[in-house]
Amino acid sequence: MKQKTSTAMRLRALVLSVLLTMPLWVLAQISGVVVDAEDGGPVPYATVQYKGNRISAVADGNGRFRIERHNGWRLTISSVGYREQVVNVNPKTPAQFTVRLSSENRTLSEVTVKSKKKSRYSRKDNPAVELMRKVIANKKKSDLKSHDYYRYQSYQKIGLSLNDLKPETLEKGIFKRYPWLREQVETSQYTDKLTLPLTVDEMVTEQLWRKDPKAERTIVKGTKSSGVNDLFQTGEILTTVMRETFADVDIYDDYILLMRHKFSSPIGRDAIQFYRYYITDTVYVGADRCIQLDFLPNNQQDYGFRGQIYIIADTSYQVKRCELYIPRSSDVNWVESMQCMQEFSKQENGEWLLTIDDMIVELMLTDFIQKGVVTRTTRKTDFSFDPLPDSRFKKKNPLQIEPGSDSRSEAFWQEHRQVEFTKSEAGMSGFLTHLEQLKGFKYVIFGLKALIENYLETGTREKPSKFDVGPINTFISQNFYDGLRFRVGGQTTANLNPHLFAKGYMAYGTRHHEKYYNAELTYAIAPKQYLPQEFPVNNIIFSSKRDVALPSDKYGINDKDNVFASFKVHEIDKMFLYNTQRLAYEFETSTHWRFSGDLKTERIDPIGSLELKPVALDAAPLSKMRYTESTFGIRYAPDEKFINTKQRRRTTNKDAWYVQLQHTIGYHGLLGGEYAYNYTELEWFRRTWLPMSWGKIDTRLRLGKQWNQVPWPLLPMPQANLSYIVHPQLFNMINNIEFLNDRFASLMLTWEMGGKIFNRIPLLRKLKLREILEFKALWGSLSERNNPYLQQNQSSTLLMNFPTNSYIMDGKKPYFEYAIGVQNILSLIQIEYVRRLNYLDLPTATKHGIRFTITPTF
């Protein structure tokens, strides 16, 4: 009896287990039926597959199929004679649905008929153009910012892989020696090519919006990175640059910033003039009947897309699906192909909003370097338009990073990951371990770090570097006083102390056997991850320096000892030996306000033909002069974003405008200071993108005034570029200390046209050259109180005679120069012809010049 009871209980438990797990099994499956879009009849034996993931199924004779559910993957349904259809599987994809396939023959026939027409494209009485006008007119219906509030969650995965590996390659060389490397290779679900994933990065954010008062917030809830970028301390630069370069696309914007270029949107305000449109078919996208509209730019080398837009076939004129491609003849560098696929989903309130945004960019630097592919997938979910409490907007920083966002648990990622990892992506950690065990691999990484980061690390991934040696490109340089110059330096990192940082160098000049040094100690009030300049700064800095430099070196962005910038276009025989001690405080807010203040005492000794000669006839030249000053500055750059290199912090979004104001006060008698003065300077920068792919114009304005009587070393000097390297923010044809003013205004305009003209010249079109024009102007004047040549100033105890070949500008005659250049020579080189327009009668004036730089960019 007991045995029968026990058997019955086991049977009931088994049945209960099956019943409980059956819903989970059903939810993990997708089933459907494939039908002909025209007559609704079943399409038998259609192929249903996740391309690149080796999971597939075949529909039965009635068109019915069943396949595993993999959220974030692309399900492709195809059959002979029909156009394949792709379904982006996500949590909202129903467990059962109908797939309607359009006949390939009918569509091809229509396209063939159209292609045979030789008639000129016309916008007048063109139904495709009229349809697009209605789509553009109804754009506001999908504008999230028309709501008083919104919130949604965004998941993004971005990866970098080696691309287009050949099957024969996997059977020889390193792949044959290391089977684990061959196992890392997979087939891309987007391109069907063999790829080797190298990095994969994830980010989960919450997007918030309030219309009144206007506020927008991005809250980073989780980030995760794995792959070869973990081998580099600055590896997050790769992730940041990829996110900036291959950013999310919003076709409802007028222009789309992608790969450092602005592309005209196919539904932007200038789209009708920029693109050609053709209605090609009526198809089903999912369950929605859509009008397929193909488009391409008038000139396919302009920065525009070709592709298809699928518009809901009703009076809403909303976009259901969009496929964007960069034409093969496009002017973009190193991109073999780019495709961006977007899908819009109907929300409960009836709006069509972007929920799926995938981008695949195949890269090719040269024929002999392995190709790469960047894959970026974005999913937007959980849209809500309910009012948000003011507390969600209390913090003013538009980008907020939750504590612990970079160390979320696996449970967090299982909950928020909208796109499943492939086998190779999931095994990235083991792949990295295998790589590090390769013989000689650590030496390869050491060399790559030196090349990429310009510093030599003294640690490993297991024991991170506490001290980095560099910059490498300053180890050897030259100048007229030192001759050949040797320098060695380095800096501590947060691995030694996250608050206290030291950096500096020792240098030696071979001609006069002079020794120099620079030592800097920084206390970061907020702990840093690696270096003290990480945003936002809240630092106290003390530095001491003894070194030679040109007066204009303070305006340069690069280190003055950069070996490439140490060769000058003019003969240099005037320098100063600086002996400087400085105490500074720098503070940045999360809203990108920057406040700074310092106290500096500096002694300068003239070198070469430079003299510090007072105007009094009986006065002897001075061997030195000392001044003590404080500089207080404020800077605002609300849209700036950064990456942290080991040398400096760099702005990633060059479109960000800024304005800064600083005032300097000189103290007589403080720390040996011999002069009292006030100097004010204002700088403003803005980038303007021109419509219709006419490029961009950078505008830079600077104003400055010295309010007191001072010797000439304390007067503002023109920002002169004395090297052969292009510097857009410096004057190319002004010599060392050529003009001395006590008030000035400078305007610099740079117009990068992006090949707009060259692309229309048949012989130049294939070279993908790009035009650049520059115009620079300087207005300056010298007040009577600072003019050493006036009789009334001959008894001054402050003024000094100007150096040889230094001049006073005519206040009614601004200085002008321009440059005409060619960018993108061999996809790397920029060469400019620079021309000085006036003040040519001065003995040191040079009328013409050539400048160059290497600027790798898309």
Predicted regions and their residues:
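Short Pro-Gly-centered beta-turn/loop motif in secreted/extracellular proteins
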Residues: G40-P44, R66-W73
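Structural motif
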Residues: Q29-V43
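Hydrophobic beta-strand segments
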Residues: A46-Y50, L75, V113, Y152, ...
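Short, acidic Ser/Thr/Gly-rich low-complexity loop/linker segments typical of extracellular
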Residues: R54-R64
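Exposed, low-structure sequence patches enriched in small/polar residues
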Residues: H261-F263, K395-F858
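Structured extracytoplasmic
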Residues: K117-C290, L296-G304, T366-G470, T474-S477, ...
